[in-house]
């Protein structure tokens, strides 16, 4: 996994991942940023053709004017209650988003830190979940480049620190590049 401090909407990868609501309409956070940067009308039409997404699953639309080829919409829900089930649900969102990109023959995917803002997943937990799922996916899909894109320096530094610590616990599996 590669860490990127920047704007996911500018990533020139095969796909970018969006943290989406089940109605696939623009919502706050990264979702709103993606809709604003894309041709909003075209993206809303593409999402409208799909209709709804199931929580924990992912659906794909064209990029609608962004540098990437596809937008993978990972459908989440609020973390308010927390617990193991919520953690598994968020892990499924990452897993299904990466799997969807793989099924579309994507060789590079930009993934944001999903659900830690408006969906209320605590940021350190969100970082660990993202790191665990991305590392596991890389083991079984070594040809795919996965970029964890973080929009703010403090979150970027937190992610590097937390995932470097879990890296040491994984006995040196290299994923922080």
Model-identified regions with their sequence ranges:
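Glycine-/small-residue-enriched capping loops at alpha/beta junctions
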Residues: 1-103
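Phosphate/ribose-phosphate-bearing ligand recognition and processing surfaces
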Residues: 79-177
């Amino acid at each position: 996994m590669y860490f990127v401090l920047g704007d996911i909407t500018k990533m020139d990868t095969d796909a970018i991942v969006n943290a989406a609501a089940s109605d696939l309409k623009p919502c706050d956070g990264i979702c709103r940023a993606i809709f604003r940067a894309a041709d909003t009308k075209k993206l809303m039409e593409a999402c409208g053709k799909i209709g709804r997404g199931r929580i924990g699953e992912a659906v794909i639309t064209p990029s609608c004017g962004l540098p990437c080829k596809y937008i993978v919409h990972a459908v989440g829900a609020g973390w308010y209650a927390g617990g193991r089930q919520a953690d598994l649900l968020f892990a499924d969102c990452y897993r299904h988003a990466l799997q969807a990109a793989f099924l579309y023959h994507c060789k590079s995917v930009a993934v944001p830190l999903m659900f830690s803002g408006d969906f209320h997943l605590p940021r350190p937990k969100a970082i660990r979940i993202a790191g665990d799922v991305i590392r596991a996916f890389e083991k079984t899909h070594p040809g795919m480049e996965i970029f964890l894109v973080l929009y703010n320096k403090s979150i970027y530094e937190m992610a590097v620190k937390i995932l470097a610590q879990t890296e040491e616990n994984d006995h040196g599996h290299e994923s922080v590049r």
